[in-house]
Amino acid sequence: MSDVPSAQGKAAALLARFDAARDAFLAAFAQAPDAALPYTPAGDEYALGVLPPHLQDTMNHYLDVYARMADAHYGPVDLAADPARAGREAERHRRLVVTKPTGADRAGLLGNLAATHQRVHERFAALDDATVARKADVIYSAGTDPYPTSVADIFGWLTDHYDEHSEQTGRLLAQWQSEGTQ
């Protein structure tokens, strides 16, 4: 028996890791009481409760990157060629920075995250290994060199992003508790 994955083995393995990272984030986020959701420690931009929509924005960003890669048939993609894109991203960032979710927002935040996570699943689940590994040169911002990007890379970044914010959630919660802000 070969260790070579099936035609869709690589996508399935990446999706499994992506799901596990999501589950770890959800477990960490579930530990945060509603009162902690608006907490923003000094030096941070985002409130604890903004992490789900922040994760969602990143997934939407990379779904768009992949759509552009596929539309270009894996030819070069220049995200900086869309001058309105930077403005939209800056506005989304600004909106997240000023958002201070409450417990009443929790179900909606998590529902939206689940829906976006599912869209990632639906978009990538049926891809074969060759497509998952295929790279396109993507210019992410003006003045930068193209970065060879594949679906496997995108999954790595999204999985790492969940992991980063799982750890951050624990740290923010501990900091919130130590400051006696509950």
Regions found by a protein language model. Name each.
Residues 6-9, 13, 39, 43-50, ...:
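A structural signal for alpha-helical segments
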Residues 1-34:
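Long, hydrophobic/aromatic N-terminal blocks
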Residues 143-158:
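Individual transmembrane alpha-helices with interfacial aromatic-anchor signatures
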